[in-house]
Amino acid sequence: IIKCKKCPRLIRFSKKISITKRKQNILDVYWGKPVTGFGDINAKLLILGLAPAAHGGTRTGRAFTGDKSGDFLFRCLHKIGISNLPSSTHRKDGLILNSTYITNFLKCAPPSDKPLNLELNNCSNYFDNEIKNLTKLKVIISLGKIAFDNCIKFYKKNFIIKEKFIFKHGAKYNLPDGKILIPCYHPSPRNVNTKVIDTQKMIKLLKFVKKIL
């Protein structure tokens, strides 16, 4: 994955932000390559985002690491025992996930957080491989509507689906391969600041997921 060159626009953007950097990260050496998933290969739970953050995963080389969305997510994961640490700051911070794997559908940060359909299609094979390699997987939590929509789109490519899937926080959908999909509001700073998602809502959803694993 980290050697992928399928999407020239995304490669250019990753290189650009790795050179220009953000003021508070000016001394950091940016990863600047596609970002793979990470976690327990025997995971029963998959947490799926859309794409790595420009100055989060693209900087640190790990999904939901080094950005505010990750800060919120890992505080919640730690509180219910899924993560051994309450934060995710860099690839060698000693973080361990319990029966959980975290990835993004798109492996590179898109400009303005708006990926093209071609770019999403280019990445779908990587997601396919992740799903196949996680042989004990039972539940997928999709963070945000776009990640949810692309997960459904992926399944529609591979299975005949008649059910209508609508993004609703905390809903439970049975997928045709026996897995369960649960939509969740994305823990973005905007959603957290406007109380669309808060610690209580996230913990409640995660506790529900733990019961069905």
Model-flagged regions — what are they?
Residues I2-L213:
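A polyanion-binding, active-site-adjacent surface
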